[in-house]
Amino acid sequence: MILLDTHVWLWWAGGVPELSARARAELEGADRIGVCSISCWELAMLVRLGRVELDRDVRSWVALALGDDRVESLPLEPEIAAEAGALDHDLPGDPVDRILYATARALDVPLVTKDRRLRRYDAKSTLW
């Protein structure tokens, strides 16, 4: 399994060419693709704030984007929420990024992200 940061999920599901060659190859070869439920919330917030436009309403987009047989929706478990809050101060402070990173660590899977701050924090557990 690989875990997708929200922007990677949006680009992959939307067929946007922003993905790196490595990210695209990892997505094509993955047997399972994890999407955290917090990414659904983040996407809805970005749409509401006008920072992201979708070709349909956000609920329909999420349902369609989670419909791929390889995609697994991952809930925010209490242990992961606690881990995200306890991560050291060097990790970027964005709560969504912290939750995504804690989820990847808990599942021992790579986090696919373009976010340089996350990649600098832990180059071994992230990929782009």
Language-model segments: residues:
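Active-site neighborhoods of divalent-metal-dependent phosphate/nucleic-acid chemistry enzymes
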Residues: 53-59, 67-114
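Short, structured coil segments at secondary-structure junctions
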Residues: 69, 121-122
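Short, well-structured N-terminal submotif of metal-dependent ribonuclease cores
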Residues: 1-35, 49-64, 107, 116-117, ...
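Acidic active-site catalytic centers that drive phospho-/nucleotidyl reactions
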Residues: 5, 42, 97, 115
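Active-site regions of enzymes building and remodeling cell-envelope glycoconjugates
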Residues: 123-128
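Generic structural signal for small/hydrophobic residues in well-ordered secondary structure
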Residues: 6-7, 43, 84, 104
